[in-house]
UniProtKB/Swiss-Prot annotation:
It comes from Staphylococcus aureus (strain COL). With S4 and S5 plays an important role in translational accuracy. Interacts with and stabilizes bases of the 16S rRNA that are involved in tRNA selection in the A site and with the mRNA backbone. Located at the interface of the 30S and 50S subunits, it traverses the body of the 30S subunit contacting proteins on the other side and probably holding the rRNA structure together. The combined cluster of proteins S8, S12 and S17 appears to hold together the shoulder and platform of the 30S subunit. One of its GO terms (biological process) is translation. This is Small ribosomal subunit protein uS12. GO terms for molecular function: rRNA binding; structural constituent of ribosome; tRNA binding. Belongs to the universal ribosomal protein uS12 family. The gene is rpsL. Residues 1-57, 118-137 are annotated as: Disordered.
Length: 137
């Protein structure tokens, strides 16, 4: 417990909040070739590589991911949610924040049903997360 004198000399410092998705908080001025502070909920990007990755220790699977170059020229790894996808190199995707806990280095999700990404076929529940239209029946 500090004394009043200690607090007068050096007051308490508030914690600095670090962003969970730093690539979404930058814009790029291509004319000046400089980064600017520009917070966005999502960003557009182009897939440079689509592949699979194995998760961390207790889990076992082949998780689908894409390497994406965002509109601010930052390259990130983004998870492709849902069963099956139509992404390939040069596909244009929409990326949102949100990490995948068992994949190291994956801090972003691809939004299904937006731009070149199709929704998940045959999905009945939780459709909005997977970009699936309401079935006709």
């Amino acid at each position: 417990m500090p004394t009043i004198n200690q607090l007068v000399r050096k007051p308490r410092q508030s914690k600095i909040k670090k962003s969970d998705s730093p690539a979404l908080n930058k814009g790029f001025n291509s004319k000046k070739k400089k980064f600017t502070d520009l917070n966005s909920p999502q960003k557009r990007g182009v897939c440079t590589r689509v592949g699979t990755m194995t998760p961390r220790k207790p889990n076992s699977a082949l998780r689908k991911y894409a390497r994406v170059r965002l509109s601010n020229n930052i390259e990130i790894n983004a998870y492709i949610p849902g069963i099956g996808h139509n992404l390939q190199e040069h596909s244009v995707v929409l990326v949102r924040g949100g990490r995948v806990r068992d994949l190291p280095g994956v801090r972003y999700h691809i939004v299904r049903g937006a731009l070149d990404t199709s929704g998940v076929d045959g999905r009945r529940q939780g459709r909005s997360l997977y970009g699936t239209k309401k079935p006709k029946n």
